[in-house]
A protein has these predicted regions:
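A short, glycine/small-residue-rich beta-strand->loop->alpha-helix junction that serves as a flexible
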Residues: 5-17, 42-43
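Short amphipathic alpha-helix
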Residues: 15-26
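A conserved catalytic-core segment of Leloir-type glycosyltransferases
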Residues: 33-139
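Nucleotide-sugar donor phosphate/pyrophosphate-binding loop at the beta->alpha transition
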Residues: 128-134, 170-172, 180-197
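Membrane-proximal helix-turn-helix segments that form the acceptor-binding/catalytic region
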Residues: 137-143, 188-205
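Active-site proximal beta-strand in glycosyltransferases
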Residues: 148-150, 157, 161-182, 195, ...
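A short, active-site helix/loop in glycosyltransferases that binds the activated sugar's phosphate group
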Residues: 200-222
Length: 222
């Protein structure tokens, strides 16, 4: 299960609803693994196993989910970005790579971690895309430990899609609120496309009410 927040660290109703759902599933004997961008260690894990996406090691420069990466915009900085190395030392370091014909970044075998804020700040779209990269790795790491993928609201839909593509497991997306609920008719087109992509690729879509269901059918053609 992919969420964006989990009690006690919540900013709205999404985390509370996710917690209630995990408790309900646990009462029916369903084991839930709940992935969040940032866990703090004080989450109630009596009913759920919480996975902190900020602690997941992912292959450096992994392009297996290239279509998600393409939604990010990168700005090149023409600078010797190697930490803790003086300019003279860097030149010597780089010359060795040029002499041997290797690229300065030999990425094979490297791993990295993404540090998520888990909030709703200025870098939200970037975090949503990076969360999908981590979700793909989570699906690989937990292969054989889950039967179903459940993604809560648009923030996690790319993550759900990535996990489905890696694992082949069915995807359920949970529509708590649409972009039309949040913004009226003046929707954010990026959010709308993420919502539509998530529902299109899902095997099942859960709407929290008949009103929401009708809105999904009317506005998204699902």
């Amino acid at each position: 299960m992919f969420g964006w927040e989990f009690p006690p660290h919540i900013a709205g109703g999404l985390g509370t609803a996710s917690y209630g759902l995990t408790r309900g599933l646990a009462k029916h004997g369903i084991e839930v693994i709940f992935v969040v961008p940032k866990a703090y260690g004080d989450e109630d894990q009596r009913f759920v196993r919480v996975v902190n996406a900020s602690e997941i090691e992912t292959p450096f420069g992994d392009t297996r989910e290239q279509d998600v990466w393409e939604k990010l915009t990168f700005i090149h900085i023409d600078s010797n970005m190697v930490p803790y190395v003086a300019p003279e030392e860097f030149d010597s370091y780089a010359e060795e790579y040029r002499r041997t014909g290797r690229t300065i970044l030999d990425k094979e075998g490297w791993t990295e971690r993404y540090s998520f804020s888990g909030k709703y700040g200025a870098n939200l779209m970037e975090e949503v895309a990076r969360y999908a990269m981590v979700a793909a790795q989570v699906a690989r790491d937990l292969a054989g430990q889950f039967d179903l993928i459940h993604a809560h609201d648009w923030l996690t839909y790319y993550a759900g899609i990535a996990a489905k593509r890696v694992s082949g497991k069915p995807l359920v997306v949970h529509m708590h609120a649409t972009e039309f609920d949040r913004s009226g008719e003046h929707v954010n087109p990026q959010v709308y496309e993420i919502e539509r992509a998530g529902m299109t690729e899902a095997d099942r879509v859960i709407a929290v009410s008949n009103l929401r269901r009708n809105l999904v059918i009317e506005k998204y053609g699902i």
